[in-house]
Amino acid sequence: FLLNCHDEKGVHQLYELSSRAWLRSYMFRGLRRRPTFYSDIEEIIGKEPGHVVGSSACLGGYLPHLILEGNFAKAKRFINWCVKIFGEGNFFLECQPCLEDNEEQITVNKALWALHEEMNVPIIVTTDAHYMEEKDKEIHKAYLNSKDGGDTREADAFYATAHLFTPKELRNALHICFDDEQIDVLFQTTNEIADRVETFSLKKTTQVPALPSLPSFHITHQYQPYYSKY
């Protein structure tokens, strides 16, 4: 899922999650992977919830995978776990726009709405923006296929709606899955997250950590004969 902080305490929680992930990072298929464990979320956010909001992410997320597998019992358990850890009102089901032939995203969007109504978990809409506007689609496609071998990937279908939308464009795209009343709910809940963000500065003076007191020691000069040589 995705994590977003809305106050300074949340920033420090994300710092700690990031530090833990980097400490266990490893290389896989040419990329450095930095996994965050569920236990990290429980220990850092679960101990003091209310400073970070979580959402269920795109089709690559765990919850959409469970939905596409038809495992709704496990999906509900996962949602309940998220609500427990992040706190009531701090976990969101996340819909995204798609084209009419994207059956997986349509299935997930409709299932998420049903779960929203059944479990009373708030629902939002996001755009997994990889480029600025729709007119930049071909440039983005060329970039994806520019590596050696001409890998065409899934640039046309997968990234067709992966750009920033105007409200009107987004509403039109969402009509594939939702009616106007549902879209109003999606927009309103998404804006409520932005309204919760506090204004604060990350600019700080340099903070030098205090070192522990070192035990006293005596220099024995065991290598003194080599001082002048090396």
Question: Where does each model-flagged region fall?
Answer:
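Phosphodiester-processing cores and adjacent nucleic acid-binding clamps
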Residues: F1-Y230
